[in-house]
Amino acid sequence: HGDMTDEEMHSLYKHPKISAFMSLAHGEGFGLPIFEAVYSGIPVVATGWSGQLDYLIDEEGREQFYNVNFDLNHIQPQVVWDGVLIKESMWAYPREQSAKEKMRQCYEDVTSNNEDSYAGNADHYAEIIHERLDQDSIDTGPQR
């Protein structure tokens, strides 16, 4: 984040003009920007693949995001990177129509204040994430 403080970064996600966060990544190790959005209580539209599923799916196995469908295929030969991206690696290729549908659904949920949606539940889920990351949980391991 360069020279930005945690508070400055958080303020970007909480800016009044920001209604949601979208990531159509092929794959993420952890997905820090996605996590920061969840932690900040804004709805997320994302490819349902890779590391971000560790926190985008709650402890009961329910998705807490607008899940964009994808096709899982090998990476393109031109992006092979020795020691990082091997030719056998697989990437999620988001489906365009699914992305459009999930963006529209998120937009409609946000603008209608749909409390029964991922958008309507984003602040509550952020609270759960905060609780899971409190100092006691860090000291003693995950609470299940």
Spell out what each predicted region is.
Residues 1-16, 50:
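Conserved active-site histidine-acidic residue motif and adjacent donor-binding/catalytic loop
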Residues 90-101, 105-143:
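A charged, aromatic-enriched C-terminal amphipathic alpha-helix characteristic of glycosyltransferases
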Residues 17-19, 41:
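A short alpha->beta transition loop at the rim of the catalytic pocket in nucleotide-sugar-dependent
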Residues 26:
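Aromatic "clamp/platform" in nucleotide-sugar-dependent glycosyltransferases that forms part
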Residues 43-46, 56-57, 63-67:
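Short hydrophobic beta-strand element within catalytic cores of glycosyltransferases
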Residues 37:
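Donor-sugar nucleotide-binding helix/loop cap in glycosyltransferases
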Residues 47-48, 68-70, 74-76:
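Conserved acidic donor-binding loop of glycosyltransferase catalytic domains
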Residues 31-34:
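Short glycine/serine-rich donor-binding loops of glycosyltransferases
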